[in-house]
A protein has these predicted regions:
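The conserved acidic donor/metal-binding loop of glycosyltransferases
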Residues: 43-47
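Short aromatic/hydrophobic "clamp" motif used to bind/position activated sugar donors
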Residues: 39
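Short, flexible, basic/aromatic active-site loop/helix in glycosyltransferases
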Residues: 82-108, 112
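Active-site-adjacent helix/loop segment of glycosyltransferases
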Residues: 138, 142-199
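Acidic donor-binding segment of Leloir-type glycosyltransferases
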Residues: 1-16
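Glycine-rich, basic loop-to-helix element that forms the pyrophosphate-binding segment
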Residues: 16-34
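Conserved donor NDP-sugar-binding/catalytic core segment of glycosyltransferases
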Residues: 50-81
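A short, conserved alpha-helix in the catalytic core of glycosyltransferases
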Residues: 106-154
């Protein structure tokens, strides 16, 4: 697979790990290997529009002080961002707006900027699955860096539609376990044990 991919596309470097490290740890490997000013994290279960990536690039040239840019989900019932406390909603004429956090299925990192302020891994590897993106966004906001949604860059998240029906129950059990652990760890890390146990 690796050899075929790299021989087909001359600008592609494929990194294979010996086991499933989880979303955060797996992405950390790629982020560290990247020598570019920007890094795009993109899950395999997304559908891009023709202009999705180009609109992110255009936005990155308009505002150079961002930490993360993200496209907007086309599923309005499940937004891929959390608004800041002082902002109740956004209007369609806002092509860029600051947010509290974004979902991890599509994020453009300003690597040149973040490498100067993130001393270790981008993603905390204690999270195997769930909330690793919220943790990163929380840490980024604590150092007064900005996260933006680019509303004319659109993306559809399928959300694990390719799950084998035979494994569905087992996968659901695993997901539930990881969600409970990640929520506990996130709350303990940012708000203390009392909130972690109460949530």
């Amino acid at each position: 697979f690796k050899e075929e991919l790299e021989s087909t596309y001359e600008n592609v470097s494929c990194v294979l790990t010996s086991k499933n490290l989880g979303m955060g740890a797996g992405n950390n490997i790629g982020i560290k290997k990247a020598k570019t000013d920007f890094v795009l994290i993109l899950n395999p279960d997304v559908v891009l529009e023709e202009s999705t990536i180009n609109e992110l690039i255009v936005a990155s040239r308009k505002i150079t002080n961002f930490a993360i840019l993200a496209p907007i989900s086309t599923d309005t019932n499940h937004p891929n961002y959390r608004l800041l406390k002082n902002k109740k909603t956004w209007t369609k004429d806002e092509t860029l707006f600051k947010v509290k956090s974004v979902d991890g299925f599509a994020m453009l990192f300003n690597k040149k900027k973040l490498d100067k302020v993130i001393t270790n891994n981008y993603f905390d590897e204690n999270f195997f699955m769930y909330l690793e993106n919220d943790d990163l966004c929380e840490r980024i906001r604590k150092i007064n860096e900005d996260i933006f949604i680019v509303s004319n860059s659109k993306i559809k998240h399928l959300g694990g539609k390719g799950v084998n029906e035979k494994l569905k129950d087992k996968i659901e059990l695993s997901r539930n376990w990881h969600w409970i652990w990640s929520k506990f760890y996130f709350n303990q890390k940012h708000y203390g044990y009392s909130k972690a146990f109460l949530e």
